[in-house]
């Protein structure tokens, strides 16, 4: 049987699901190829969606017609707005999820989507003719013809699992890895691949935990859903939130770990690749911060119908017997029983300097990459790239203008710009500090910023868009003190007048600050040619992180512009450096003036 599609998506994780749904909803005949049709959109690490800057990206995907926000709202166990004690610009929604329910709901969404088919198989190579991809070869030897291909392989690309000194092939524990595709990406597509690693935590039985010794962490009293389409009051009524719990490691825990570093797969030479700096294993934390006597361990439920509990903060590559000892040394976990052991996983990734801002490869036309294959880490970063790659694959097939989000429009735009411009030498994670426009690209205004784009692509229906236009007009009228003939909530639903008023309050609060922000950004752009002294001591800049100082000392940039292009250097770092150099210049000028006097 001949199989021919407009778009073929390889991989059915968070990136692959968003990519395939976007293409199918754009009216394109789409195929998603997965190693296991029963494990789509799994949460193999933390069973949560959102967080600092990540929650903003989920809202952005939702505002443009993506799926992750809607599914999260239906699978949520607990909701918290992070940074709520600070200004709204950095408020970040986060939801603890029922991991099985999330996977089931996303899988159902993919299965029920018109124009979208699923095939369980392994993609072994790509067919490339005259510099353009035209198909995917699968394990059976069959070739799937496709006008465009999106690769979203996650940790499965030559994935290797390490547990102490044990190591074996796998994309996740008990799941096979994709062994053949890497060779084709190198030989047929001319891509350079590297290796990254990450670790996950042990899961324990909730019945073996003494919660009375821990601090209970409640969800928000008035949770706010991720998706604009979720009706807030109805959702809150039906939401049964579960608590998370907080405990800590201690000197005994640290001694068990430090005495056995040589047995961890992270240190015995089995895993030589870089891991996420901001999601370190417990081994790395204890080695990196020997002065600390404790580290947080968040004890998080994994679902309504399971006793499995996730130990957030105990990512590890230690042998299983030492994992048990380590866990039992922690207060409240003295009698804890392990259900699944933590492990390290290594996988292939492609340097994102080899892709355009559309996420199309520079070496092969109509081939797009999304998610961890681009060197990022996190479900949200993956979903965002999957969405962008899927949309652009669809637009390329349709012969339409590419879809590119800019840094001043969205966190997704910042993510794509960062990875395609600066590249990386360790897994990339999104933070609010990476966003110079964070005062204007908040989580609360994602719909106002991006729903026009979603509608123009064809992922927001005309019906939903008409409601949105009514809401936007209400927002504008309230802003301009013209609130006499506002529509009823019934006409605005799922938006409301209350939501519009809240948005106006935040908008007015930040109006002046946004002007200052934009002036500062323009000043930074103008100062890109400013020289940095060769012997400049970055330790003088107390506001810079240790990572930033390390990068600047390593590269020794000659100008502000060069410094801004260094991997992992954030706009906030450049602002600090620019202000300091400006201050130094003024001081020198003043000294010179005083001498003349």
From Swiss-Prot:
Pfam families from the UniProt entry: GIDA, SAM_GIDA_C
Cofactor: FAD
Binding site for FAD: 11-16
Keyword match Flavoprotein: yes
GO molecular function, one term: flavin adenine dinucleotide binding
GO cellular component: cytosol
Biological process (GO), any one: tRNA methylation
Superkingdom of the source species: Bacteria
Binding of NAD(+), residues: 275-289
Signal peptide per UniProt: none
HAMAP family, per the entry: MnmG_GidA
Function: NAD-binding protein involved in the addition of a carboxymethylaminomethyl (cmnm) group at the wobble position (U34) of certain tRNAs, forming tRNA-cmnm(5)s(2)U34.
Family: Belongs to the MnmG family.
Known partners and oligomeric status: Homodimer. Heterotetramer of two MnmE and two MnmG subunits.
Protein name: tRNA uridine 5-carboxymethylaminomethyl modification enzyme MnmG
Name of the coding gene: mnmG
């Amino acid at each position: 049987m001949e199989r021919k599609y407009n778009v073929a998506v390889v991989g059915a994780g968070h990136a692959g699901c968003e990519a395939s749904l976007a293409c199918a909803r754009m009216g394109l005949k789409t195929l998603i190829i997965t190693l296991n049709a029963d494990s789509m959109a799994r949460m193999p690490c933390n069973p949560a969606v959102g967080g600092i800057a990540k929650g903003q990206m989920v809202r952005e995907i939702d505002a443009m017609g993506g799926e992750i926000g809607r599914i999260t709202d239906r699978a949520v166990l607990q909701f918290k707005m992070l940074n709520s004690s600070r200004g709204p610009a950095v408020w970040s929604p986060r939801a603890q999820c029922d991991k099985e329910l999330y996977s089931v709901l996303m899988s159902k969404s993919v299965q029920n989507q018109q124009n979208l088919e699923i095939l369980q198989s392994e993609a072994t190579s790509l067919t490339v003719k005259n510099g353009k991809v035209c198909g995917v070869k699968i394990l059976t030897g069959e070739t799937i013809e496709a006008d465009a291909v999106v690769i979203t392989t996650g940790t499965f690309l030559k994935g290797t699992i390490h547990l102490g000194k044990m190591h074996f092939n796998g994309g996740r524990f008990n799941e096979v890895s994709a062994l053949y595709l890497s060779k084709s990406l190198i030989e047929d597509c001319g891509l350079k691949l590297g290796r990254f690693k990450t670790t996950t935590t042990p899961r324990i039985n909730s019945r073996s935990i003494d919660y009375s010794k821990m601090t209970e962490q409640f969800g928000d009293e008035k949770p706010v859903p991720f998706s604009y389409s979720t009706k807030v009051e109805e959702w809150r009524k039906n939401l049964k939130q579960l608590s998370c719990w907080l405990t800590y490691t201690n000197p005994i825990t640290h001694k068990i770990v430090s005495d056995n570093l040589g047995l961890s797969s992270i240190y015995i030479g089995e895993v030589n690749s870089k891991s996420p700096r901001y999601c370190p294993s417990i081994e790395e934390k204890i080695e990196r911060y020997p002065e600390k006597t404790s580290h947080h361990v968040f004890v998080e439920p994994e679902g309504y119908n399971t006793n499995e509990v996730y130990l957030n903060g105990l990512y590890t590559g230690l042998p299983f017997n030492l994992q048990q000892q380590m866990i039992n040394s922690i207060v409240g976990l003295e009698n804890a029983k392990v259900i699944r052991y933590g492990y390290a996983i290594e996988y292939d990734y492609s340097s994102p300097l080899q892709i355009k801002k559309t996420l199309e490869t520079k070496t092969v036309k109509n081939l797009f990459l999304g998610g961890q294959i681009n060197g990022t880490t996190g479900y949200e970063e993956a979903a965002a790239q999957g969405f962008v790659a899927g949309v652009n694959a669809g637009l390329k097939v349709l012969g339409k203008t590419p879809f590119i989000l800019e840094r001043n429009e969205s966190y997704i735009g910042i993510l794509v710009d960062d990875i395609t411009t600066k590249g990386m030498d360790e897994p990339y994670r999104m933070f609010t500090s990476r966003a110079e426009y964070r005062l204007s690209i908040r989580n609360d205004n994602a719909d106002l910023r991006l729903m026009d784009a979603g509608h123009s692509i064809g992922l927001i229906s005309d019906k939903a868009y008409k409601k949105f236009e009514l809401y936007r007009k209400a927002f504008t009228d309230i802003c301009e003190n013209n609130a006499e003939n506002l529509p009823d909530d019934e006409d605005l639903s799922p938006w409301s007048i209350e939501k519009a008023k809240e948005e106006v309050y935040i908008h007015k609060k930040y109006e002046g600050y946004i002007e200052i922000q934009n002036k500062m950004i323009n000043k930074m752009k103008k100062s890109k040619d400013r020289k940095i002294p060769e012997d400049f001591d970055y330790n003088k800049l107390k506001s810079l992180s240790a990572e930033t100082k390390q990068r600047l000392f390593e590269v020794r940039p000659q100008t502000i512009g060069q410094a801004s292009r260094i991997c992992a250097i954030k706009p906030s770092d450049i602002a600090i450096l620019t202000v300091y150099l400006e201050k130094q210049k003024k001081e020198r000028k003043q000294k010179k003036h005083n001498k003349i006097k």
